[in-house]
UniProtKB/Swiss-Prot annotation:
This is Signal recognition particle receptor FtsY. It is an enzyme of class 3 (hydrolase). GO terms for cellular component: cytoplasm; plasma membrane. It is a peripheral membrane protein. GTP binds at residues 228-235, 309-313, 373-376. One of its GO terms (biological process) is SRP-dependent cotranslational protein targeting to membrane. Involved in targeting and insertion of nascent membrane proteins into the cytoplasmic membrane. Acts as a receptor for the complex formed by the signal recognition particle (SRP) and the ribosome-nascent chain (RNC). Interaction with SRP-RNC leads to the transfer of the RNC complex to the Sec translocase for insertion into the membrane, the hydrolysis of GTP by both Ffh and FtsY, and the dissociation of the SRP-FtsY complex into the individual components. It catalyses: GTP + H2O = GDP + phosphate + H(+). It comes from Neisseria meningitidis serogroup B (strain ATCC BAA-335 / MC58). Keywords: Cell inner membrane, Cell membrane, Cytoplasm, GTP-binding, Hydrolase, Membrane, Nucleotide-binding, Receptor. It is found in: Cell inner membrane; Cytoplasm.
Length: 421
């Protein structure tokens, strides 16, 4: 009986265990499925997260790349601009250096050309400048001063020399009479003694032309108006006068009144830069307006001297002569007593034509002085005698060279000595 019950229990145990196993297996399977599901969800979540991070990283990298591209492009653009500016600066520097070198070379050449003349002194430089005129007269007068008795033949020979030296008929007649009187008064007999008589006669004739320009002590600008024909050396004389007045401690202002020639303005600007002097100019407008502005500027700045350039003109060009009269009138409006000095610049090479020019400009403007230039380039040094006889306007300055210091006040004694010694 008991064994029956025991056997029955043994039979029930495997079934129970199997159910438990199945239940455990099912539970494990469920848990495993849940784990797999969780893993799958985690994997998907991780994948999404990684994808987002990757996309974000890609976007960040792309943005960085674009930024780098933009930065590089900006840097390249700036580099190109800098290169262009550098190239422009290099070209400008080249031009500036070339200009500076050119000016320096010009100054050195001029300095070399004039160094010996400066060493000689003005009297010797004047004599050197009048070499052509002196040599011509010396050859012509060799027979006159070479000895022999003073007679009518000798006088006729002397008269011919004076006429061919551009002294003109009036001056020649005056000199011949004066020489005859001296010969008679002193009892001269020999041709060698005529030189001294001629020198004194010529000196007495041209001495009245020796009236140096005296600048008044005033607070107002002293206005000097310059006129003349083209090529006489007007603009160059203005540049030299500026240097001359500066050496006397005067402040100078230049008026580029030659509005017909652009080259004249440029030339005057160059002289202004060379002397560190202000130049008043206009690309348009007339000469009178430029000169008026220059005087106004000089008064405002306390300048001592105004040098007013005007356009070159022939006395026969009546409309241009009327224009230069207008310049004078406008200057008088700028300052009631201006221009204080009206100077005509004469080229000594034109000989007797200089007398006609002086007459025409004097009649039109009322000249106060003359500048005779280029005496070193002509054999017509006798022109001063003709001027003294026909129209004795004071010769303020004479020029005997290209150097900036080769324009000096006229000295009658030095001139005669340089011409006849």
């Amino acid at each position: 009986m008991f064994s029956f019950f025991r056997r029955k229990k043994k039979q029930e145990t495997p079934a129970l265990e199997e159910a438990q196993i199945q239940e455990t297996a099912a539970k494990a399977e469920s848990e495993l499925a849940q784990i797999v599901e969780n893993i799958k969800e985690d994997a998907e979540s991780l994948a999404e997260s990684v994808k987002g991070q990757v996309e974000s990283a890609v976007e960040t990298v792309s943005g960085a790349v674009e930024q780098v591209k933009e930065t590089v492009a900006e840097m390249l653009s700036e580099a190109e601009e800098a290169a262009e500016k550098a190239a422009e600066q290099v070209e400008a520097a080249k031009e500036a250096v070339a200009e500076t070198v050119g000016e320096a070379v010009g100054q050195v050449q001029e300095a070399v050309a004039t160094t010996e003349e400066h060493k000689l002194g003005w009297a010797a430089r004047l004599k050197q400048g009048l070499t052509k005129s002196r040599d011509k007269m010396a050859k012509s007068l060799a027979g006159v001063f070479g000895g022999g008795q003073i007679d009518e033949d000798l006088y006729e020979e002397l008269e011919t020399v004076l006429i061919t030296s551009d002294m003109g008929m009036e001056a020649t007649e005056y000199l011949m009479k004066d020489v005859r009187d001296r010969v008679s008064l002193k009892g001269l007999k020999d041709g060698n003694e005529l030189r001294g008589a001629l020198k004194e006669a010529l000196y007495d004739l041209i001495k009245p032309l020796e009236k140096p320009l005296v600048l008044p002590e005033t607070k107002e600008p002293f206005v000097i108006m310059l006129a003349g024909i083209n090529g006489a050396g007007k603009t160059t004389s203005i540049g030299k006068l500026a240097k001359y007045f500066q050496a006397q401690g005067k402040s100078v202002l230049l008026a580029a009144g030659d509005t017909f020639r652009a080259a004249a303005r440029e030339q005057l600007q160059a002289w202004g830069e060379r002397n560190n002097v202000t130049v008043i100019s206009q690309t348009t407008g007339d000469s009178a307006a430029v000169c008026f502005d220059a005087v106004q500027a000089a008064k405002a700045r306390g300048i001592d001297i105004v040098l007013a350039d005007t356009a070159g003109r022939l006395p026969t060009q009546l409309h241009l002569m009327e224009e230069i009269k207008k310049v004078k009138r406008v200057l008088q409006k700028a300052m009631p007593d201006a221009p204080h000095e009206i100077i005509v610049v004469l080229d000594a090479n034109i000989g007797q034509n200089a007398v006609n020019q002086v007459k025409a400009f004097d009649d039109a403007l009322g000249l106060t002085g003359l500048i005779v230039t280029k005496l070193d380039g002509t054999a017509k040094g006798g022109i001063l005698a003709a001027l003294a006889s026909d129209r004795p306007v004071p010769v303020r300055y004479i020029g005997v060279g290209e150097g900036i210091d080769d324009l000096r006040p006229f000295d009658a004694r030095a001139f005669v000595d340089a011409l006849l010694d």
